[in-house]
Amino acid sequence: DGVFIFDVHSTYKTDTVFPGYSYHENAEEFAMVWDSYADDAPHSVVHELTFFLQDEDGRFTRYDEVHEERTYEVLTYDILLEQAGFKSFKLYADFEDKKPRKKSERWFFVCQK
């Protein structure tokens, strides 16, 4: 018996918000570039991040990261949770105690074993 809580990006976010997303920040001691692209698999995205961090001697060191993310339809999570032995779950969205809407960006699952 127990509760399992997790969150994922919604399909709306992976399919509509992230593709073409770009964020850049420039401060005195660091700079950051974040670009996102749709990936080949359904509801998947690639984030390319580049950081420039200032060292003690004043020079900047570059760090690159690639993050690949994928989400699924709620029905897929439902099936997988049932296969894992969970009896029920409640679904919330966007850090609120509300059901997801069409343009919700993050889903929160509260699952009962």
Language-model features, listed with the residues they occupy:
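C-terminal lobe and adjacent flexible extensions of AdoMet/dcAdoMet transferase-like proteins
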Residues: E68-K113
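Glycine-centered, small-residue-biased loops immediately flanking beta-strands
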Residues: G2
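SAM-dependent methyltransferase
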Residues: I5, H9-T76
